[in-house]
């Protein structure tokens, strides 16, 4: 980043994407301090991919799946869900429900759900048909409520026709 700024590339033409919010913030702070920049305005594209997609798609927190939404989904489907949330710092998903974990992991790996299921050595008592039905029901639930999860954000962003053009 230092070299690009020294070479005259405008800070807003630099896209710096990290896995964690902490790393993006640290990089922006260092560059801002070193070059006398405003981290928030001049280095607006120093962020996580999830944060960038969220911003570019004009999302709001209310449109994102939260714990209460997962809890409601679990109650509707008759599956216990005590924990289910995406980390705001790095977009990772954490759930005590193995079905949701498998559904999310397949999405992250961009694998077909049943192919991913078949590739695992399923030590836990996870039924293939139940997994498929829950994944379909989760899609329907999110669509009916107008909600997205972090994986949906990335997919929607990739499908978006217009993107910012960065020098680096």
Task: Describe each region flagged by the PLM.
Residues 39-42, 48, 67-74, 136-139:
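SF2 helicase/translocase NTPase motor core
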Residues 1-62:
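P-loop NTPase Walker
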Residues 66-90:
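Conserved phosphoryl-transfer catalytic core
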